Amino acid sequence: SVISLLVIFSFFTLPSINIFLDKNFNFKKSVISNAGVNFDQELEKRKKILDGEKETKTNKLNLKNIFADIDFFSTDDEGQNSIRFDARTIEQLFKDTNYNLEKVRETKLVNIGNKIDHLPKEIKSIESSKKRKRLFIQIVLPLIVEENAKIRLDRKELFRILAKNINTQKEKNWLKEKFKQYGLRDGDFYSLKVRMDEIPVSLALAQAAKETGWGTSRFAQEGNALFGQWTWNGEGIRPAGVDKDAKHKVAKFAVLKASVRAYQRNLNTHSSYIEFRKERAIQRDNDEKLDSLKLVNYLDKYAETGQQYIDVLKQIIKQNSLTDFDDVNVMPTSNKTKKLI
């Protein structure tokens, strides 16, 4: 819809930061010497694809494609949204399916079938902060894990394709779609492999908790907005207390899952987070586990409070032991979910 396109463009109105990645990444290269193909030439070609010198800026011509698969809210959705369950019903659902955070911490698995489309209104009335936080994490955790699993699957497919000398038309079409999705020109493999990566679960949970007050904010309740992303032209919620002339709003989403996907796509494409992606790529290159407490240092531009925002996120991660969830994967309950592992 027109509203969705306006929302899409609004995410990229922040000033661009012309910071380049200056570290090469070492990947194992598999080159098959075919008849008539010069081995050295083929090796050099693959080296150029895999070992770039910098991540390029987002292609402005492709900005509209970045959020094309995300279900933003529009007035057409009024009255057609999925059911909002109350807190008691959600808690009973989790109990019936034996879904609790203690078990998740132990097994490192979460059932993504426990997906909730909207936060319960009653979460604001839960007096116990411990109980409120637990319910919030139970609701948001499966959404983050599932979206990360999809990115991980795409990343695996990307490297499988790059390891081949000759690609099928289906593979070429897949690559073309991913270049669009990540705001890049066709053939920019280096930038694609840097951008196509996961966001640590602990970091995403901490940001969602901070931006929504553990699910109690008006933006989260009315617009399924877990990460406070702004829009200047699209459908959104106007923050209270802002100047009348202020044009920005907080973007609304049809369901919570759409907010998670938009957040990940934003961190993976916006020029403000190029240093975040650089550090993440370095951790990958060194075969390290993604460290949210290091990566969070590169999110000072996510909020106007800068370093203070970073300090708050670190505190949330540590106090709530959120890094326990960084290794959590999708529980294989069906053939569909098995493919995400």
Task: Please report, for each region that a protein language model flagged, where it lies by residue.
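Catalytic cores of secreted/periplasmic lytic hydrolases that degrade extracellular macromolecules
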Residues: S1-A206, K210-I341
